[in-house]
């Protein structure tokens, strides 16, 4: 049986986004504990996202005009079950990366509550990178930030979704992979929703997961503290 990996977080997604999905084919079905679970496909190979569990719950949410439903995202690992290296090394992991076929609408403040951002971007620290190859002077930083701000202040463009990678950090914790500046501006502009595309590759070996979860939580806390103090 293929290894089914689950997101570390539950995401409050617009129920209309989930209702639009077809049910997961019988040959890919696996038992899951969460009421609503979406199995992401692979946009590059034409595999579509499907609803693994929770059709009735989604219908109820639509009938009740609920603004969101809690969704667990799942994927089949592209990395071998006993591969103890690839999931921890970004260049290796990138070879196996898949992207969801659909985008999903989530309130940006709800994403922030999940504590999955690796950096909190504001006007003050926009386009400041530790890598000197990506150095921008003050004028260029301001220009780029203002350009992005002006393009977003009237609404979020779904053509530029955030990339949230499932189990990105140490194969155990979801994090925002791309889109930190968009997240910051969406919150600054009080946008109700942002578009999110999920990506994935693999998960840490199960025997290591309890320890790695503790390390990952400490890691992201320290990363945010160091970058935003």
Give the label of every model feature segment.
Residues 7:
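Glycine/charge-rich catalytic "coupling/switch" loops of P-loop NTPases
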Residues 1-4:
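Non-Sec secretion/translocation targeting segments of pathogen effectors
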Residues 13, 19-53, 58, 62-65, ...:
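Short alpha-helix boundary/capping and kink motifs at helix termini
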Residues 212-213, 226-229:
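Conserved double-stranded beta-helix
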Residues 37-51, 55-91, 96-97, 158-218:
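A short, basic-hydrophobic beta/loop patch
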Residues 88-118, 122-123:
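Active-site-proximal loop/hinge segments that shape catalytic or ion-binding/gating pockets
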């Amino acid at each position: 049986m293929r290894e089914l990996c689950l997101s570390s977080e539950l995401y409050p997604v617009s129920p209309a986004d989930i209702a639009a999905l077809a049910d997961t084919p019988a040959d890919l079905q696996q038992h899951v504990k969460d009421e609503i679970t979406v199995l992401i496909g692979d946009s590059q190979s034409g595999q579509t996202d499907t609803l693994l569990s929770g059709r009735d719950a989604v219908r109820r949410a639509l009938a009740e005009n609920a603004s969101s439903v809690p969704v667990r995202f799942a994927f089949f690992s592209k990395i071998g079950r006993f591969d103890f290296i690839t999931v921890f090394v970004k260049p290796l992991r990138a070879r196996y990366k898949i992207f969801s076929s659909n985008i999903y609408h989530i309130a940006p403040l709800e994403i922030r509550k999940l504590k999955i951002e690796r950096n909190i971007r504001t006007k003050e620290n926009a386009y400041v990178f530790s890598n000197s190859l990506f150095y921008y002077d003050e004028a260029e930083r301001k220009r780029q930030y203002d350009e992005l701000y002006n393009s977003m202040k009237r609404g979020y463009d779904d053509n530029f979704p955030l990339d949230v990678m499932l189990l990105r950090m140490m194969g155990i914790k979801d994090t925002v992979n791309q889109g930190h500046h968009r997240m910051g501006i969406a919150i600054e502009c009080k946008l109700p929703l942002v578009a999110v595309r999920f990506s994935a590759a693999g998960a840490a070996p199960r025997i290591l997961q309890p320890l790695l979860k503790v390390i990952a939580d400490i890691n992201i806390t320290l990363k945010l503290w160091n970058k935003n103090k």
